Amino acid sequence: VHWTADEKQLITSLWGKVNVEECGSEALARLLIVYPWTQRFFSTFGNLSNAEAILHNPHVHAHGKKVLTSFGEAVKNLDHIKQTFATLSKLHCEKLHVDPENFKLLGNVLIIVLASHFTKEFTPACQAAWQKLVSAVAHALALGYH
C-alpha cells in the first residue's frame, strides 16, 4: 500500500486521540450486534443474547481493546502492514477459522465508531485515509486464506 504524507498524517493524528479501550470495545460490540452471525467465533464469551448483554460483556470489552491495540500496530507500521499481521492472519485462518469477510465488517464498524467519536476531525479526507487503512488491514489478515 502506498501512503501519501497527508494520509499518514490524517491517520496518525486521529489515532493519537483514540481511546483504544472505549473505541475497541464499542467496535467489537457493534460488530456482534449488527452482524450477529459473527458471534459464533466468540462462543467462550458467555452471554451474547442481546445488545444489552453484549454491551456489558467483560469479554467483549477486553477483546475489543485487544483488537484495537493490534490495529494500532498497523498505524505504527503503515509501510509494513502485511508483515505486521502475518502471525494474526495465520492464527485467524488456521486455528480460529474466521471468515475473512468479517475483517472487512469490523473495519467498516470501526469507521463508524471513529466517525461518531470524532465528528469534526473525521472529514471525508480522513475517512478516505482510514478506509484505505482498514481495507489494508483486512487484506493482510485474510492473506492466510490464499
Swiss-Prot record:
Involved in oxygen transport from the lung to the various peripheral tissues. Heme b binds at residues 63, 92. Residues 2-146 form the Globin domain. GO terms for molecular function: haptoglobin binding; heme binding; metal ion binding; organic acid binding; oxygen binding; oxygen carrier activity; peroxidase activity. One of its GO terms (cellular component) is haptoglobin-hemoglobin complex. The keyword Heme applies. Signal peptide: none annotated. Belongs to the globin family. InterPro entries: Globin, Globin-like_sf, Globin/Proto, Hemoglobin_b, Hemoglobin_oxygen_transport. This is Hemoglobin subunit beta. Keywords: Heme, Iron, Metal-binding, Oxygen transport, Transport. One of its GO terms (biological process) is hydrogen peroxide catabolic process. Heterotetramer of two alpha chains and two beta chains.
